[in-house]
UniProtKB/Swiss-Prot annotation:
Record-linked InterPro entries: TLDc_dom
Source organism per UniProt: Aspergillus niger (strain ATCC MYA-4892 / CBS 513.88 / FGSC A1513)
Biological process according to GO: response to oxidative stress
Subcellular location field: Cytoplasm
Family the UniProt entry places it in: Belongs to the RTC5 family.
Keyword Cell wall biogenesis/degradation: no
Skewed-composition ranges (Acidic residues): 338-348
UniProt KW keywords: Cytoplasm
TLDc domain sequence ranges: 363-574
Descriptive protein name: Restriction of telomere capping protein 5
Gene: rtc5
Main location (coarse class): cytoplasm
Region (Disordered): 1-23, 158-177, 329-352
């Protein structure tokens, strides 16, 4: 299954060429060989057929070289481009820059920006959909450095022996018939003193598969003190805005479902979330973001940030104008065929919603906030974010709908038998708005609860986070020692102290009931009136439920923020309905309704109990019943709580 149609070497490799040792090949030839291996080993025959149809039916022919330009790529993917009259995102140039860099893999140092030939597009799709495991077995499933390079601008150091007034060319927009063009300077060695050996895993694995390690070493043997690479704030913000808009995208779902109705109100929310995410990155004095900072924040705070790129580029593997009911000879693919037009925007379906109907509608969550959450919250499995894992949010409790009562909170939350997402918004003493939340994959438990019906894996850890005005994430502590300590639950509820997340629970005492105390790297406490919250963050302590945020994200000392709560919501996590229906059993919604029905029946029974009638035995029996229910006596104080 060759790649002859767009290669600049004039066709498939001949048998005599195949017999030559790899070390005798040029970089362009090695790049071509890798693309051919990707094509044959990383795609099914049907996927490769669709990819060829999509590419060649739209390709521009210049002197026998077929390629895509920025407009072709943007139009196919449905990405707003600067050439459009109304373009609030203007993400086309950023995506084109990225793929022009990735198309030169693994020789970005000398071949990037590449012309988007078919061979280049094969590598782009393989890298962005993470299909390279069948070829690059030694590579980490880690694209951070590669993605950084595809986004980075270059600032040249004032090193006299290397300057001579030369400028680094980064023009990736104008395609040229020759694929050997000046490289991106991000791949010029830059005296990186962090993770050098790990950074090149993908490239080394690619060249190892070609027996061309020596070629790579020769290509990289340059002065590592000449260039500094930085991602500009504008470039990253434009990419973030696109990712926020398309984060719910499913495979083969039209992108325009999410990009066709970008009203000013919608764009205001998108910009707000992008700015909150941008605030998490410390910038250089020049305003750019270094690789070290980019890798640190993406790894620790946004593990799923680039997930939307996978379904976006999987569109290339399905052609709408390929008629599978007829045999079509596409071996040489030299002629373009008419491309089936997309449905008019008026006929596009509405974007699906993650929130289920229930007792209230959110005043905190909107589509942009949910996209922000999907960049770091897992689903019932750690491998997928909660959007790609098809998790749904069921409305459980809201202060707007149910009031600021702990009794109401207990009635709605403690009867929910799956994980929960707690979010609140309010102001700090300066009047600045904050949005804080906690992701609790295991259900809250009442004191006498012994079982959990959560469909979420125990390996999915809780986390504490701040969404605005600056993104901050405190990951769950994976230590089994911490998880087994019953006095340090992820979340705790008590009618006497309120709600405590990430706190240490003191021993119970009849004479002196002490409130839970903040413990470890982070905690959130909410008073009994649900009006005030305290958010504690410590930069170094690691003995609690949550781990410290990335270094440099917070001050060097413990910070306590008092929040006047405006709104508080608890959302139930409903796993993928297709998975849960296959497993059988009742859903969390059905179980909650059953508990409410049981509580109603018990309440009716209690009304018939009269402590002042009957003999002493009847009175004692009735009192015992109410104490057991935690409604009167010492049992009420001991049992008025819950944890998760």
């Amino acid at each position: 299954m060759g790649l002859s149609q767009s290669t600049e070497y004039g066709g498939q490799t001949s048998s005599s060429e195949k017999s030559n040792p790899v070390s005798d090949k040029t970089l362009e030839e090695l790049s071509y060989v890798l693309a051919e291996r990707f094509a044959t080993k990383c795609f099914t025959p049907l996927e490769l057929t669709h990819l060829k149809d999509n590419f060649f039916s739209r390709a521009i022919d210049q002197g026998g070289l077929k390629y895509w330009n920025e407009k072709t790529l943007s139009d196919f993917l449905g990405i707003p481009d600067s050439s459009e009259s109304h373009c609030p995102l203007d993400a086309g140039p950023v995506i084109f820059r990225m793929v022009s860099y990735l198309g030169a893999f693994p020789f970005q140092n000398t071949l990037a920006p590449s012309v988007l030939t078919f061979e280049a597009m094969v590598k782009v799709v393989v890298l962005l959909t993470e299909r390279y495991g069948k070829v690059l077995r030694r590579a980490r499933r880690d694209r951070i450095r590669l993605l950084f390079g595809s986004l980075a601008d270059v600032g040249r150091k004032s090193v006299e022996q290397h300057t001579n007034g030369d400028e680094v060319s980064e023009d990736a927009d104008a395609p040229a018939p020759n694929s050997h063009v000046p490289g991106f300077a991000i791949d010029e060695p830059a005296n990186d003193d962090y993770e050098d050996e790990e950074d090149d895993d993908l490239a080394l694995a690619a060249l190892e598969s070609l027996d061309a390690i020596e070629v790579f070493k020769h290509d990289s043997r340059m002065d590592r003190a000449v260039y500094e690479a930085r991602i500009s704030a504008d470039t990253l913000r434009r990419l973030l805005m696109l990712l926020i808009v398309i984060s719910p995208l499913k495979p083969l779902e039209p992108v325009k479902i999410y990009t066709s109705d970008l009203t000013e109100e919608r764009m205001k929310a998108v910009r707000s979330e992008a700015d909150d995410i941008m605030a998490a990155f410390n910038r250089e004095p020049s305003g750019g973001i270094s690789y070290k900072e980019f890798a640190r924040i993406v790894t620790s705070s946004f593990p799923y940030l680039f997930d939307p790129l996978t379904p976006l580029f999987e569109h290339l593997l399905f052609s709408r104008n390929l008629n599978l009911s007829q045999k079509r000879n596409r071996a040489d693919s030299t002629a373009s065929e008419p491309v089936e037009e997309e449905a008019p925007e008026d006929d596009l379906p509405s974007p699906p919603t993650i929130t289920l109907p229930g007792s209230f509608e959110s005043v905190i969550l909107n589509s942009s906030v949910i996209s922000h959450l999907s960049f770091f919250l897992p689903s019932s499995s750690e491998s997928l974010n909660f959007l790609r894992g098809n998790v749904r949010l069921h409305p459980v409790f809201s202060t707007v709908a149910h009031g600021s009562s702990l009794t109401s909170f207990s009635h709605h939350v403690l009867t929910w038998s799956s994980g929960t997402l707690l979010v609140l918004e309010g102001t700090d003493p300066t009047g600045e708005m904050l949005t804080i939340g906690a992701y609790l994959p295991q259900p809250w438990k009442s004191p006498n609860s012994t079982q959990s019906s959560s469909k979420f894996s125990n390996s999915v850890l809780p986390c504490l986070f701040q969404l605005s005005p600056k993104h901050l994430l405190l990951q769950g502590n994976p230590s089994s020692t911490i998880q087994q300590q019953s006095n340090i639950p992820a979340a705790y509820f008590s009618t006497s102290s309120g709600i405590s997340i990430g706190c240490q629970i003191p021993p119970s005492s009849r004479s002196n009931q002490k409130p839970p105390t903040p413990h470890g790297a982070g905690s959130l406490t909410i008073d009994v009136s649900l009006e005030t919250a305290q958010f504690h963050v410590s930069p170094v302590v690691r003995n609690g439920v949550f781990l410290p945020p990335p270094p440099g994200s917070t001050p060097d000392t413990t910070v306590k923020t008092t929040i006047e709560i405006y709104n508080l919501e608890v959302w139930g996590l409903v796993p993928d309905p297709t998975t849960t229906s296959a497993e059988g059993g009742k859903s969390a919604v059905e179980l909650q309704q059953a508990k409410w029905d049981f509580e109603a029946q018990e309440a009716e029974r209690r009304r018939s109990v009269n402590l002042k009638t009957g003999g002493s035995a009847a009175e004692e029996s009735a009192r015992w019943l109410l104490e057991t229910a935690g409604l009167i006596g010492d049992g009420a104080g001991r049992r008025a709580g819950g944890s998760v």
